[in-house]
């Protein structure tokens, strides 16, 4: 496609499978250096091997993004491995949590706060690189009724609102902020 991404640094959380892996694959195919994280070490290693076939730098590290300290350490290591950070793709998912206190809290920690914390840490690095983008992976469930998992839809709606505010707040620093909202896959 020739998107002029050769040598750009891209972090994709939740990048070992599904949408996250597809996003990381797209960036790697365009020559970007990519860092991914996930909880499952077997899926993470398989994704690392797959992404490495494109010839770019690939950094992969196990991380539970709901753990603020673990996320901070991962993002620091990823920035160091990539040398620069131009794009952060926040793609964590806690889909399928129960409609109880524990399910709600886990959804908040994974689907909202991991993206908020990741953005806080990434924004100065992206600005230092001359600007770039933060992309939040939301869901159609954040835009319309979702009866299967109430916490998931509500938290994705909150992420959509955060994205709007963050886009305005970071524009003057050369950082575009968008959310994508895939439907059922």
Q: Where do the language-model regions lie?
A:
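Conserved glycine-rich cofactor-binding loop
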Residues: 9, 16-18
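The beta1-alpha1 cofactor-binding region of Rossmann-like NAD(H)/NADP(H)-dependent oxidoreductases
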Residues: 41-42, 62-74
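Substrate-binding pocket helix/loop in short-chain dehydrogenase/reductase
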Residues: 95-108
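Active-site loop-to-helix junction immediately N-terminal to the catalytic Tyr of the SDR YXXXK motif
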Residues: 104, 145-153, 165
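Active-site helix of classical SDR
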Residues: 119, 155, 163
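Alpha-helical segment proximal to the catalytic Tyr-Lys
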Residues: 124, 168-169
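Residue(s) in the substrate-gating loop at a strand-loop-helix junction
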Residues: 139
